[in-house]
C-alpha cells in the first residue's frame, strides 16, 4: 500500500468510527457524539498501529491496557471493540443505551468485552490508569528475567478537558510523575469545549507546563486529526521509558459535522437526521447506518494480528516456565487471583495461642499485627497510606517502600486520598496484586466516589480507615467521624467492618482478602479496646457479620453494638443483670454481611419481637432500620467536640450506665 492509499484507508477507518458513534447516538436519542467524532483519528492511529491486544482473549495478561477516561465518549470505544473483532456484534451497537445491552451509556467493566474499567466520573479513569501502570511496573520487576520480559505492556489513556479540571487529575498525575511510570501514555483531547461552552473562560491552564512540572514527558501541539503526526507522537512516547507521557492533541469536537462541529451543542445531544445526512455527503460516506464497508471492516480487523501477538507471548512464557518454573507458577496463581493455600495459618495461630492480638489493643494495632502475619504469605499484597502510615499502622516489618525502579510492596501515596483510592482500583483491575490503603475514617469522604466505583466494578480492594469515632478525642469534630460509617454502608456491594477486638479484626482481614467481588472497609479504633472470650462456634460466626457475644437464658432485651461500643454494651448488660434484667449482647462488625445471611440465622441472633437497643458512636438513623419502630438507637447525631475521649463518651451519653438506663426505659414503655 503506498502512502496516499494508506492515508485514504486511515481516513475511511476514522470515518467509520464517526458514523457508528453518530448513528448510535441518533438511534438512542441520547448520548455524546462530539468526543468520539473528534477523537476518531486518535483512536484509529492508536488501535490500528500501536495497541497490542487480542480481541479473542480480552484477559491476555500482557495486553496493552486502554482506558477511556472521558467515558461519555463510550460509543468510540464500542465502535473500536466491534471493528477490531471483540465479541460485540453490530446488534449491540444498535442497542446503545438500552436496558441490558452490552453498550451502556458509559463503559462498564464486565458488561462489554474489552472494557478495562468503568469510567464516567471524570478523572477516575486517568487515576485508574496510573494504578494499572504502577502494577505493570511492579510485576515486571518481580517476574521478568533476562531474556524473558513476561510483563511488558503499556497503559494508554484518552482524556479530555473535564478530566484535567478534576482535582483528582492533579493527585494521580503528580504521583505518576514521582513514580516515573514510563509506560503510561495519555492522549489529551484538547478540543476547548465543555458542556457550558468554550473552556477558555474557566480552564486557562498551561497544561503542557503543568505536566512538565509533574515530571512528565510532554509532546505538545499535536494535530489530533493528522494521522502521521499522531503516529510519530506515539512512537516518541513509547521510546520514553523513564517518564509518563502526555500527548496534547488539538482536535475539533464533532469533527465532520458540517454545521455543528466545534460547538458545545455537539457534546451531549444527537446531531439530528439532517446534520448526519449532510455529514455523509460532506465525507463521501455512502454506507447506511450501522453498516461498515467491506474494505474498512478488513482494515480494522485485528483478530489475526492479536492472535499472533498472544501466541508469540505464549511461546515465550512456555520457555519461561522451563527456565523459571517457580516464578511461572506464582505468576499464573496471581494472574488468576487465587490466594495461596494456607495463607491464613500464621494469623489463625495468633488466635489459637496467647498473643498480643488477644490482649487489650487498638484495632488499628490489631490490624497491623494481622498484616505482619499475612504479608509474608501473600506477596501480592500492596500496601500504602495517604501520608498516615504511622497513624494507620498499615506498614509491617516486611514493608519495602516502592521506588523508581519498581521494587517494593508499599506505596507512600502522599496526601492524596482520592488519588490513592482510584489508583488502588487500577491496581486491582490490572491483576496480580491486592491493594490496601489507609487514611483517617473522616477522610474517607475524599475517597468515597472511588470506593463506590470499586463496589460497582466488584474489585478486591481494602480500605483501612482508622481513628473511627469520638474515641480519637482532642482533634475535634473535623477529625471525628459521625456519618461516615452509615455513608459507606449505603454503597451497594461495599462491606464495612467495624471490629471490636483483635479476633474480629483478624476475621475482618480474612473476609476482605477472600472476597473476590467487591471492596471492604476496615473501620478501626485509635484507642485500645478490651478483648472478649469466645467459644469456637462464636469465633466462627464472626465471619457471618453478626453473632451473639453474650447470651443469657430468657433475654428480655438485645443490645447490638459495633467496634469500641461493644465493650460499653457488655458492661451495660452486666448493669442490667444487677437490676434483674437479662440482656443479650450482639456484636455486629459487618452489617451488610449479617443481612446477607439466611433469615433463620438472623432470627436466632435477633429474635423477632425481642426489644433491641443499638449502640454505635455515629449517626443513629441507619440503625433505626435494625432496631425497628419499637427499638432504640443510641449514637451521635451532631458533630463531635474537642475533648478527651472519656469526656466525650460521657457527654454524648455513650456509657454503660446510659445504655442500661435507656434499655430499662425501653422495657418500661414496651
Curated annotation (Swiss-Prot):
SMART domains: Transket_pyr. Binds 1 Mg(2+) ion per subunit. Can also utilize other divalent metal cations, such as Ca(2+), Mn(2+) and Co(2+). Binds 1 thiamine pyrophosphate per subunit. The lineage of its organism: Bacteria, Pseudomonadati, Pseudomonadota, Betaproteobacteria, Burkholderiales. The active site is at residue 417. InterPro entries: THDP-binding (IPR029061), Transketo_C/PFOR_II (IPR009014), Transketolase-like_C_2 (IPR055152), Transketolase-like_Pyr-bd (IPR005475), Transketolase_bac-like (IPR005478), Transketolase_BS (IPR020826), Transketolase_CS (IPR049557), Transketolase_fam (IPR033247). This is Transketolase, chromosomal. One of its GO terms (cellular component) is cytosol. Homodimer.
Amino acid at each position: 500500500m503506498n502512502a496516499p492509499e494508506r492515508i485514504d484507508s486511515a481516513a475511511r477507518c476514522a470515518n467509520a468510527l464517526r458514523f457508528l458513534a453518530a448513528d448510535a447516538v441518533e438511534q438512542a436519542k441520547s448520548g455524546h457524539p462530539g468526543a468520539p467524532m473528534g477523537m476518531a483519528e486518535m483512536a484509529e492511529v492508536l488501535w490500528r498501529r500501536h495497541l497490542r491486544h487480542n480481541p479473542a482473549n480480552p484477559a491476555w495478561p500482557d495486553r496493552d491496557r486502554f482506558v477511556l477516561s472521558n467515558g461519555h465518549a463510550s460509543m468510540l470505544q464500542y465502535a473500536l471493540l466491534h471493528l477490531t473483532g471483540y465479541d460485540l456484534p453490530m446488534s449491540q451497537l444498535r442497542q446503545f443505551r438500552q436496558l441490558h445491552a452490552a453498550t451502556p451509556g458509559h463503559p462498564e467493566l464486565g458488561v462489554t468485552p474489552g472494557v478495562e474499567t468503568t469510567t464516567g466520573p471524570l478523572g477516575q479513569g486517568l487515576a485508574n490508569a496510573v494504578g494499572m501502570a504502577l502494577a505493570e511496573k511492579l510485576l515486571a520487576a518481580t517476574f521478568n528475567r533476562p531474556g524473558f520480559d513476561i510483563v511488558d505492556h503499556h497503559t494508554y489513556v484518552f482524556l479530555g478537558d473535564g478530566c484535567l479540571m478534576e482535582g483528582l487529575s492533579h493527585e494521580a498525575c503528580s504521583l505518576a510523575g514521582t513514580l516515573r511510570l514510563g509506560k503510561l501514555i495519555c492522549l489529551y483531547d484538547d478540543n476547548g469545549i465543555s458542556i457550558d461552552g468554550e473552556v477558555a473562560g474557566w480552564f486557562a491552564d498551561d497544561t503542557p507546563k503543568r505536566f512538565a512540572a509533574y515530571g512528565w514527558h510532554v509532546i505538545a501541539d499535536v494535530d489530533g486529526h493528522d494521522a502521521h503526526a499522531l503516529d510519530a507522537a506515539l512512537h516518541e512516547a513509547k521510546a520514553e521509558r523513564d517518564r509518563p507521557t502526555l500527548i496534547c492533541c488539538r482536535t475539533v469536537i464533532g469533527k465532520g459535522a458540517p454545521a455543528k462541529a466545534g460547538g458545545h451543542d455537539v457534546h451531549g445531544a444527537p446531531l439530528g437526521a439532517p446534520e448526519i445526512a449532510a455529514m455523509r455527503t460532506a465525507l463521501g460516506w455512502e454506507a447506511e447506518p450501522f453498516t461498515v464497508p467491506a474494505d474498512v471492516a478488513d482494515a480494522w480487523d485485528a483478530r489475526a494480528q492479536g492472535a499472533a501477538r498472544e501466541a508469540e507471548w505464549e511461546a515465550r512464557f512456555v520457555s519461561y516456565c522451563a527456565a523459571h518454573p517457580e516464578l511461572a507458577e506464582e505468576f499464573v496463581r496471581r494472574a488468576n487471583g487465587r490466594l495461596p493455600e494456607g495463607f491464613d495459618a500464621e494469623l489463625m495461630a495468633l488466635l489459637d495461642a496467647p498473643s498480643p492480638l488477644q490482649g487489650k489493643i487498638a484495632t488499628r494495632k490489631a490490624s497491623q499485627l494481622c498484616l505482619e502475619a499475612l504479608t509474608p504469605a501473600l506477596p501480592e499484597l500492596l500496601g500504602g497510606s495517604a501520608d498516615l502510615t504511622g497513624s494507620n499502622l498499615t506498614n509491617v516489618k516486611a514493608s519495602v517502600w516502592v521506588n523508581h525502579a519498581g521494587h517494593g510492596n508499599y506505596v507512600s501515596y502522599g496526601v492524596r486520598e482520592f488519588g490513592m483510592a482510584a489508583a488502588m482500583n487500577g491496581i486491582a483491575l490490572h491483576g496480580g496484586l491486592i491493594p490496601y490503603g489507609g487514611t483517617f475514617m473522616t477522610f474517607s469522604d475524599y475517597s468515597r466516589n472511588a470506593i463506590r466505583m470499586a463496589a460497582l466494578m466488584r474489585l478486591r480492594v481494602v480500605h483501612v480507615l482508622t481513628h473511627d469515632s469520638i474515641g480519637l478525642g482532642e482533634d475535634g469534630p473535623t477529625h471525628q467521624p459521625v456519618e461516615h460509617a452509615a455513608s459507606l454502608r449505603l454503597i451497594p456491594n461495599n462491606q464495612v467492618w467495624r471490629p471490636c477486638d483483635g479476633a474480629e479484626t483478624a476475621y475482618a482481614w480474612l473476609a476482605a482478602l477472600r472476597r473476590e467481588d467487591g471492596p471492604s472497609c476496615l473501620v478501626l479504633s485509635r484507642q485500645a479496646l478490651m478483648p472478649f472470650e469466645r467459644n469456637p462456634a462464636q469465633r466462627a460466626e464472626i465471619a457471618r457479620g453478626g453473632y451473639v457475644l453474650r447470651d443469657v437464658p430468657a433475654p428480655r432485651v438485645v443490645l447490638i453494638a459495633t467496634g469500641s461500643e461493644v465493650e460499653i454494651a457488655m458492661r451495660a448488660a452486666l448493669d442490667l443483670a444487677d437490676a434483674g434484667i437479662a440482656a443479650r449482647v450482639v456484636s455486629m462488625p459487618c452489617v451488610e454481611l449479617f443481612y446477607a445471611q439466611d433469615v433463620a440465622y438472623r432470627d436466632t441472633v435477633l429474635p423477632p419481637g425481642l426489644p433491641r437497643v443499638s449502640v454505635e458512636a455515629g449517626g443513629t438513623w441507619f440503625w433505626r432500620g435494625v432496631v425497628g419502630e419499637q427499638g432504640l438507637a443510641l449514637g451521635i447525631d451532631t458533630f463531635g467536640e474537642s475533648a478527651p475521649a472519656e469526656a466525650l463518651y460521657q457527654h454524648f451519653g455513650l456509657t454503660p450506665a446510659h445504655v442500661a438506663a435507656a434499655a430499662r426505659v425501653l422495657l418500661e414503655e414496651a
